[in-house]
């Protein structure tokens, strides 16, 4: 009996091993065609849910919140009120709060050595004017007048260059006119205000040559007798008052004419209207 039981157990185990082997072979064969194994669906545990009935107060709050979220139509009054509130907030922020601090430079921050060097450099390089000592008590220029001083120096420099240029140009012109002796007799400043043809006559009209001049061309005199034809005839120009009076008279005459025209036009209109009224009255009657 015992042997038969053992044999039966061995047969069962061998059958099981054969089934497992067959299953492994099937899986190996199926792996050739399927790369992924489909996992078996697992059941999820259901969580018990509790249904709560909302109260009336919560419903009212939800409805109010929904209504607040809805866009309301903007009015001018609401826009102005919002703008005023923003302005008030800004004004409140900008309020001045007095601070308990000392005015001026805080102690210990100034470099004394650096300030002394700057003062020395200014004294050495700055312009010195002795006549300023009576006004400001020091010879150096104050900060406010340094710019005006520099502008005056530049202006004088450019004026000097202009003068040198004029002298050079004058020398060239006189050398071309063979009048270099005039430069030795007169200075450049006196010659600057003269014209090149000062020796000739001032009048644009040519003077008639007389017999005395023809006979004695070298005779020179300070006064000469000249005919009336050499002078320009004097003309009297109208004054400003006369011109203004003439303008006023013209304006008054023009205004009178315009008034007379207006009066005649008004009379014609009235007569025409009167005739029309008479015609209408006769037709009605």
Swiss-Prot record:
User: From the Swiss-Prot or TrEMBL record, what is one GO molecular function term?
Assistant: identical protein binding
Write out the GO cellular component annotations: nucleoplasm; RNA polymerase transcription factor SL1 complex
Task: Fetch the InterPro entries from UniProt.
Answer: TAF1D
Q: Where is the composition biased (Basic and acidic residues)?
A: 242-264, 273-285
Query: According to the UniProt entry, which residue ranges have a biased composition of type Basic residues?
Result: 85-104
For the modification Phosphoserine, which residues carry it? 24, 134, 229
Q: Which domain of life is it from?
A: Eukaryota
For this UniProt record, give its keywords in alphabetical order, as a comma-separated list: DNA-binding, Nucleus, Phosphoprotein, Transcription, Transcription regulation
* Gene Ontology annotations of biological process type: regulation of DNA-templated transcription
Q: Which residue windows does the record flag with biased composition (Polar residues)?
A: 21-39
Location of region: Disordered: 1-49, 85-112, 193-219, 242-285
Which Pfam family, giving just one, matches this sequence? Answer: TAF1D
Compartment annotation: Nucleus
Q: How does it assemble?
A: Component of the transcription factor SL1/TIF-IB complex, composed of TBP and at least TAF1A, TAF1B, TAF1C and TAF1D. Interacts with UBTF.
Q: Which PANTHER family match?
A: TATA BOX-BINDING PROTEIN ASSOCIATED FACTOR RNA POLYMERASE I SUBUNIT D, TATA BOX-BINDING PROTEIN-ASSOCIATED FACTOR RNA POLYMERASE I SUBUNIT D
What this protein is reported to do is described as: Component of the transcription factor SL1/TIF-IB complex, which is involved in the assembly of the PIC (preinitiation complex) during RNA polymerase I-dependent transcription. The rate of PIC formation probably is primarily dependent on the rate of association of SL1/TIF-IB with the rDNA promoter. SL1/TIF-IB is involved in stabilization of nucleolar transcription factor 1/UBTF on rDNA. Formation of SL1/TIF-IB excludes the association of TBP with TFIID subunits.
The name on file for this protein is: TATA box-binding protein-associated factor RNA polymerase I subunit D
Q: Which organism is it from?
A: Rattus norvegicus
